[in-house]
Amino acid sequence: MEVMTLADFRERTRDWPWHIATPHRADFHALMLVTAGTLRHRVDFTGYVLPPGSWLWIRPGQVHQWQNPEQAEALLIFFQEDFVAPETAELAGLGTGTAPMPLYSPDPSEAPVLAAAAEQLAAEFSQSHRHPLPVHTALLHRLLDVVLLRLAHLRQHGQAAESAPEPFLRFRDAVERGFSRTHRIDDYARELGYSTRTLTRATQIAAGLSAKDYLDQRLVLEAKRLLAHGTEPASTIAARLGFTSATHFGKFFQRHTGRTPLAFRASQRTSPPA
């Protein structure tokens, strides 16, 4: 785990301001608490504007893009998922289904409490000499738990995702495990022991779209991530996502996005809109 200010992060990064137009994809969690100015950041191809007191939570596998990091001050917290205790990970919703919206906007009564928790974590991280290493490490675990659970509490107020029908929650997790293996709703229904009608009804209630549309959206998102971040040809991405051919993948992608895979990739290598 690492905790630092955005200014420190910029100082440590030799090629700052980086290639701002280049999307990044990490295999760890990144929390950003904006403390001054306004930060603009893109996560999974959606732009977010963060005023002071707001948080951004970027999760492993998500593609993100800096836009104006020099115009804001922020506290950054980076951690691997295995640094979090299993109980906290479960309560905070780590690693379950599609990542929730990354923007968190605490109300005036919650914002200072969250900020204080983050500041305590930052202080402990920077003062490792004050305690024996086992105590220091234990404190980092506990203080990170506080931040994550408070943020998860905000998410639950705003989204109430876990109150969705159980068939949808199981389908959501099955899609995360298997979207590159099968694109057939019948296969998920058989695996989970539901009818396709039950899955579609539950997904409509929870997500506002059919089970097939939900699966297609997840495939499109992963395709966008691979196209934006990497350099693999469309044929390789097609195979990774379980399509029988690059042609089939190209038609699927264009039907859902209005662009060919290569046109989409090219659009992500230029400066995104503010």
Put a short name on every predicted segment.
Residues 53, 199, 248-249, 253:
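Short hydrophobic/aromatic patch on the recognition helix
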